[in-house]
Structures are given as structure tokens and as C-alpha cells.
Amino acid sequence: MRHRHGYRKLSRTSSHRKALLKNLAIALIMNERIETTVAKAKTLRSYIEKLITKAKKGDFNAHREVFAYLQDKEATKKLMNEIAPKYNERNGGYTRIIRTRTRRGDAAPMAFIELV
């Protein structure tokens, strides 16, 4: 049973899952909208919203924390300087998930995840 289980495994090892979320987060920050499976989008939503909340602080330590998660200078810079300031007055809810289609081949439900 999965009662009170805190996260989705996404059929991956912990290191693979961490790398997947990092790459999806970078793609979302750089493009501001990506298409992925619904399960990945839901997992990414909690990951990216925590990052944006950290980035909203705007100080040097927040910059270092965000970079530690993303390990990408351009994405960190864009998140800190462009994206996070847009959400200063918003308390959470920075992303939107829109279900789109089922993927041919494995019939996985797909969705767009975008920054609001």
C-alpha cells in the first residue's frame, strides 16, 4: 500500500530520478513550458515550486541553494533575475498543469506544465 508515501518513484533509481527532475526543471525554466507525462509533471511541480520559493529571497545564499539543485548557471541566472521577481506577491501556485493527449506507443497521459 502507498498510504502516506511522500513521492513518486517514476520507475527509476534515486539518482536517476534526481537527474530527471533536475533536467526537467532546467527545461521548464529555460522554455517556461514543456510537455511531459502527467506523473512527471506532478512531481516536477513540487520540485520547481520549492526552487522558486527559495529564489524569491533573492540573496546570495538563495542563489547558491538554487544552483546546488540545478547545477546550471544560465538556468539559475534566469530563475533568480527574471522568473522569481514575477512571483514576489504570489504565495505558491507558480505552475499550471494542462492535460493534453495520450502518447502513441505506450498510451501514457501527457500534459503541459508551464509557469503561470
Curated annotation (Swiss-Prot):
It comes from the Bacteria. One of its GO terms (biological process) is translation. GO terms for molecular function: structural constituent of ribosome. PROSITE patterns: RIBOSOMAL_L17 (PS01167). It holds the Pfam family Ribosomal_L17. SUPFAM superfamilies: Prokaryotic ribosomal protein L17 (SSF64263). Keywords: Ribonucleoprotein, Ribosomal protein. One of its GO terms (cellular component) is cytosolic large ribosomal subunit. Belongs to the bacterial ribosomal protein bL17 family. PANTHER family: LARGE RIBOSOMAL SUBUNIT PROTEIN BL17M, RIBOSOMAL PROTEIN L17. Part of the 50S ribosomal subunit. Contacts protein L32. NCBIfam families: L17. This is Large ribosomal subunit protein bL17. The gene is rplQ.
